[in-house]
Structure formats: structure tokens, C-alpha cells
Regions:
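N-terminal metal-binding scaffold of metallo-dependent hydrolase/deaminase domains
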Residues: 1-43
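Short, surface-exposed connector motifs at secondary-structure boundaries
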Residues: 111-119, 170-175, 232-238, 256-261
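Short, glycine/acidic-enriched loop or turn micro-motifs at the edges of active sites
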Residues: 66-68, 126, 209, 246
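Alpha-helical scaffold segments that flank or form the walls of functional sites
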Residues: 74-139, 159-168
């Protein structure tokens, strides 16, 4: 067991103020959080004891939307319209990445997360196997999100990853998702919708990030991306939409109706 003592503890519970105390950890799970208990502590053989020296201990921050391995593209191209940035400066470089590249780049990003107090993320990228391996090797908590679109991954691969990695315990898990409406043809979206119904699973995706994205979807389908995705049954079990910069009142009603985060 591990003991962290002489700490100021913030639990984030509304009815509990910051207090002086200690934390006991066994088998990677917190067993005790409370006032210092020196009498009981002397009865235990500790693997490690850490004097927090009065510093604050609190739950780690959670980064709800990441593309960890994209750290290699930081400042590669700034101040560009979204679609030009993606098509000209992101997708061509991503196409050259190997699974090993993504493994090591994910570990690099995780090191940066940890230095900022981030202990968990929801990570959408290209190779779930190596992403999950990187997180487990770092002892970092990650939910990998499906990223299928017209040119990478497939509905069958998403289902295989879901069956392999989706679980309620452990450091890592997997959830259904796709990159975005504008990169994913209707046939694939319908396939993901069917998986959601089969597994009673939520779906996660980028949505309404730019005005041009919304306008192009309206031109193609007669609906905004949010309404179009609802029509395809993608929100029957909720989920999450990333960005949502350009949303109509009708879009917001969809979000409320399906309790989408």
C-alpha cells in the first residue's frame, strides 16, 4: 500500500471543505481519504510513504477532447480556415504516420498532460491499439473515441475495437464515434447508428465547428449537421458533440432532447 500524508485535501464534494488529512492507495485504487490516522497507519506495512508537506491533493483534471498524437503538428500551420487547415496541412501529414509513430507521440502528449495535472482524457485518433497501449504503459486513464470517416478506419473496425476495448473498469476504454459529418458519407453514418442501437452505446463526433461546415451540410441535406445526424438516429443513446460553435436554436433543442454533452 501507498500512504500520502501531511496533505491538504480537496475532494470537490460540495459539503466538504479543504481539510488536513491523508490518502491510502492499494491495488491502484484509493482505499481511504480522511483525517490523518497515525494509530492505524503504524499497523500497516507500507510499500511507500510520501510526505505531501502541506501541499494540496485534489482530483486530476480531465481533458474531454484530445487528438494526442497531433502534438507533432503543433504550430505547423496557424491562422487558417478549418477546412483548408485540415485538407492542406493536417490530413496529408497524418497519412504518413505509422502506428509506432502514434504510440510514441501519444506518450509525449501524456507527459505534457501529467505536468499540467491532467490525469484522464477522451482521445480521438487513428490507431486505437497503439493509443491504448501508450496510455496503459504510462498509467494514464484514456477513453479512445472512434474516428471513422471516408478515408480511414471502417464501421467493422470500429465494432471490433468496441468489442475488444469497451469496458467499465481499468485505465482504458473505447466508445463509438466518427470524425465529422462533413468527412463521413451517409452509408458510414448509418452503420455507426446501427452499432449504437446494437450496443445501446453513445456516439461522439465533431460538430458545427465552422460556418462553412454548417452551410455546406444545409446545401447537401437541407438540414444543419446536428439535425441531420438526429434524423439518422445517431443520438438515440446520447453521446457528445465537440466544438458546436455555430448552433441554431433547433440544434440546441436536439442537444437537450437527447441529453448530449
Amino acid at each position: 500500500m501507498i500512504r500520502i500524508y501531511h496533505a491538504r485535501i480537496l475532494t470537490m464534494q460540495e459539503d466538504q471543505e479543504i481539510f488536513d488529512g491523508e490518502i491510502w492507495i492499494s491495488d491502484q485504487k484509493i482505499q481511504y481519504v480522511g483525517p490523518e490516522n497515525k494509530e492505524e497507519a503504524t499497523k500497516i506495512t507500507w510499500e511507500r510513504q510520501i510526505d505531501a508537506k502541506g501541499n494540496l491533493i485534489m482530483p486530476g483534471f480531465k481533458n474531454a477532447h484530445t487528438h494526442s498524437a497531433m502534438t507533432f503538428l503543433r504550430s505547423h500551420a496557424d491562422d487558417m480556415p478549418l477546412l483548408s487547415w485540415l485538407n492542406d496541412q493536417v490530413f496529408p501529414y497524418e497519412a504518413k504516420l505509422t502506428p509506432d509513430d502514434i504510440y510514441y507521440l501519444s506518450k509525449l502528449a501524456i507527459m505534457e498532460y501529467l505536468t499540467s495535472g491532467i490525469t484522464a482524457n477522451a482521445d480521438m485518433y487513428l490507431t486505437p491499439d497503439t493509443m491504448i497501449q501508450a496510455s496503459e504503459d504510462c498509467g494514464f486513464r484514456t477513453t479512445v473515441i472512434g474516428a471513422v470517416n471516408d478515408f480511414t478506419q471502417s464501421v467493422k473496425e470500429v465494432e471490433n475495437w468496441y468489442e475488444k476495448y469497451h469496458k467499465e473498469d481499468g485505465l482504458t476504454s473505447y466508445e463509438l464515434g466518427f470524425h465529422a459529418e462533413y468527412t463521413t458519407k451517409r452509408e458510414i453514418l448509418e452503420g455507426i447508428s446501427e452499432l449504437s442501437k446494437k450496443y445501446h452505446a453513445p456516439i461522439y463526433t465533431h460538430n458545427s465547428e465552422s460556418a462553412s461546415e454548417v452551410a455546406q451540410c444545409v446545401e447537401r441535406t437541407g438540414m444543419t449537421p446536428t439535425v441531420y445526424m438526429e434524423q439518422l438516429g445517431l443520438f438515440e443513446y446520447g453521446g457528445g458533440l465537440y466544438h458546436c460553435v455555430h448552433m441554431s436554436e433547433e440544434d440546441l433543442d436536439v442537444v437537450k432532447r437527447h441529453q448530449i454533452s
